């Protein structure tokens, strides 16, 4: 009673197609798909950058550890 039925959705879809035309709707869909794809690529590249920064920080910490160990051995 309070919800939208399938027939009402079909009528709304038909009106939208009549107003904008299939070419316009197709181009809008393509633009939306391209935007989603760009967003996903940006998110994955951000994750890769973060992973690279994490590994480089770990390598730096390991190098510093080795330096301090070798200095301690030399002093002993």
From Swiss-Prot:
One of the entry's Gene Ontology molecular-function terms is:
protein transmembrane transporter activity
Sorted alphabetically, the keyword list is: Cell inner membrane, Cell membrane, Membrane, Protein transport, Translocation, Transmembrane, Transmembrane helix, Transport
Give residue spans, biased composition: Basic and acidic residues.
Answer: 46-76
Q: Tell me the GO BP annotations in alphabetical order.
A: protein transport by the Tat complex
One GO CC term, this protein: TAT protein transport complex
Q: Where in the cell is it found?
A: Cell inner membrane
Source taxon at top rank:
Bacteria
State the family it belongs to: Belongs to the TatA/E family.
The free-text function statement in the UniProt record for this protein reads:
Part of the twin-arginine translocation (Tat) system that transports large folded proteins containing a characteristic twin-arginine motif in their signal peptide across membranes. TatA could form the protein-conducting channel of the Tat system.
Q: Under what name is this protein listed? A: Sec-independent protein translocase protein TatA
Which species is the source of this protein?
A: Shewanella loihica (strain ATCC BAA-1088 / PV-4)
